[in-house]
């Protein structure tokens, strides 16, 4: 179990009771992109290359945390929202796709020079996304 292909198969076997096959593929892709800094193309081109043992151990640890119910966003400590990366911790809420849609709508509604106050923002994703 030392290539992307093998690790993805391992994750599929370990997480199949909690996630769909498509969700597991997406989670693996997120891990490869976040930890290895691979692009989507790298993942496919390098799927049979031997990986560093430290990454393999980290991957297995992430799968164990996922299996215990921890969200991938908390495990990695960040998430994407409205095209931006945000730091997260268990004390902040994970932004939802519905919130991202709301931010898009409000962004279209706001006019230059409008002021907006974001109170109790948690990760700050709403206010920061609207400010840019």
Predicted regions located by residue number:
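N-terminal auxiliary segments of SAM/dcSAM-dependent transferases
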Residues: 1-76
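SAM-dependent Rossmann-like transferase core, predominantly class I methyltransferases
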Residues: 57-132
